[in-house]
Amino acid sequence: MSTLGLLLILLGIIITCTFVILRSVNPIYSILNLIVIYGCYASILLTVEMEFLACIYILVNVGAIAVLFLFIVMMININIVEIQETMKKYNIYMFVGFIGLIGIMGILITNYQIRIKEEVIADFSMFLLNTEITTLQATPSYLDFYELFVETTDLRAMGSNVIYGSQSIWFIMACIILLIGMVGVIYITEDLIIEKRKLNARRRQDINSQVLREYKITIKNYREIK
């Protein structure tokens, strides 16, 4: 199997799992499909010889963010009926997004230029009747920036350009956003736990206080039975 075929299969799996996540109301199934997407992304990085980024992607996303998301969903205890009612409102937006995705894929596909040998173009009639395999070269019209940095490694490029270089501010902002998400989860779950404890305290039966009450003071609305 060629590299292009493998990439197309991985992209197809990613798109399929994305729509499954959007349509699923079970958070466990959503997490499993999300892990499959992360694995496909890591496989794509491995095909372009970025082993370190692929390992970091699996460790960070699958090992941390996916578990954090599952922790949030399980602690908040989202009602599935409410999710189903909410998802019905966004069907039109999902349809529009699907049409937009098809349009973007069409633009990317039509953005390729096909080069044919000059001797084939010179004799067009022979080209139509020729049964032999002719070499057709499809080259993208965009600039491949990976070839400009092919002499360096992904670890060196990430360390010199992303973490400790000109893009370090975005790396720091991503860390702050992740920290805010973790603190927000703790704050939300703490409020829920406190409210649950207060509710249980109000429902608790205190027999001593009930026995010591006077019925004339406690019972206000009554009628005399003759």
Swiss-Prot record:
Tagged with keyword Mitochondrion: yes
UniProt keyword annotation of Zinc present: no
EC numbers on record: 7.1.1.2
Subcellular location: Mitochondrion membrane
Enzyme class: translocase
GO molecular function: NADH dehydrogenase (ubiquinone) activity
TM spans (from-to): 2-22, 28-48, 56-76, 90-110, 169-189
Protein name, UniProt field: NADH-ubiquinone oxidoreductase chain 6
Family classification: Belongs to the complex I subunit 6 family.
Key words of the record: Electron transport, Membrane, Mitochondrion, NAD, Respiratory chain, Translocase, Transmembrane, Transmembrane helix, Transport, Ubiquinone
Any Gene Ontology CC annotation: mitochondrial membrane
Catalytic activity from the UniProt record: a ubiquinone + NADH + 5 H(+)(in) = a ubiquinol + NAD(+) + 4 H(+)(out)
Taxon lineage: Eukaryota, Amoebozoa, Evosea, Eumycetozoa, Dictyostelia
Role this protein plays: Core subunit of the mitochondrial membrane respiratory chain NADH dehydrogenase (Complex I) that is believed to belong to the minimal assembly required for catalysis. Complex I functions in the transfer of electrons from NADH to the respiratory chain. The immediate electron acceptor for the enzyme is believed to be ubiquinone.
Membrane-topology annotation of the record: Multi-pass membrane protein
